[in-house]
Amino acid sequence: MSKSFSNSYKEAGVDITAGYRSVEMMKQHIAKTMVFGNTSDVGGFGGLMELDTEGMEKPVLVSGTDGVGTKLKMAFLLDKHDTVGIDCVAMCVNDIICVGAKPLCFLDYIACGKNNPEKIAMIVKGVADGCVQSESALVGGETAEMPGFYQEDEYDLAGFAVGIVDKKNVLDKNNVKEGDVIIALPSSGVHSNGFSLVRKVFDVESADISKPVSELGGKSIGEVLLTPTKIYVKPVLALLKEVKVKSIAHITGGGFYENIPRSLPEGLGAVIKREDIKVLPIFDLIAKEGNIPERDMFNTFNMGVGMTIIVSKDDIDKTIKVLKENGEDAYVLGTISKSDEGVEIC
């Protein structure tokens, strides 16, 4: 027997009107990124991007995609949604600059149980803020309302970045040699990896994560954990113009032990002195509260280093100078030696 519904799609849980409101509310945020080459209108079927290849011999497009992961649970708990979009952009653009690419454009994907226009607009505000920081145009996106699949007050967030680099300037890890030096770029915190462990350690579902914690300088656990992932685009691009960078690693899931070797050729490893690593207080607290062995910490988290850059030892001073001029408190982290160990922290 058939059933009769009025406004049947809405009764099924999908509110098209709310979707229209979301689009209208996010337009002001998207407009901030229009200066970076976006030539399309919000709501079109495809995002258009004006491509400037002047001065390039063989332009190569570089793409990257990622999400924010279970860090989103922190946003749900704190009901703060205007910064996770920065995380989404950061996770993508920080990856593509590892090959020397300049970000061009970005697209986001939001899937939710119920479309709350105000919340969606806040998420997109964060995405737009991240695009401004990375000088990327927000050329498109999708908001999928999926009742029965996600809880009403929860969502997932992912993104896709496209960049460009002249083929002759693509960074090649095979240029790394014994005796080269690793430069560290500090992270802003946990960034967007390891949150399944972090949430368990701090029991965030039950504990009060809004109260000040002395070990964190009076900040709350929630505030520190929700700090957006740092975007390294501007300082790295500035450095690429001044110094012959050999290789870059974005320190994400897998920490030092998984990511630094990705920037090294076979037969070479990184030697890092433990005392030289400027570990942030949040990681000391995680290790203490979770009774986590140090190797596991370095195999899970960035430990205060969000990106590593390998240069010749002759370029140390200039590299640090350029990075500091662009807001990065960079420092020498370690050296490259003949090894099959990948990373040795001693």
Over which residues does each language-model region extend?
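Glycine-/charge-enriched secondary-structure boundary and capping motifs
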Residues: S2-A12, Q28, K119, I123-S134, ...
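Glycine-enriched loop-and-adjacent helix/strand subsegments that border the catalytic/binding cleft
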Residues: Y20
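Hydrophobic face of alpha-helices
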Residues: V23, A121-V124, F195
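Glycine-rich phosphate/pyrophosphate-binding loop regions near the starts of catalytic domains
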Residues: Q28-S188
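Glycine-rich beta-alpha junction loops
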Residues: G67, G163-V165, S187-H191, R199-F202, ...
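A short, polar/proline- and glycine-enriched secondary-structure boundary/capping micro-motif
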Residues: L72-M74, F195-S196, Y331
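Short, acidic (Asp/Glu-rich) active-site segment that either coordinates a divalent metal cofactor
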Residues: D156, N169-G218
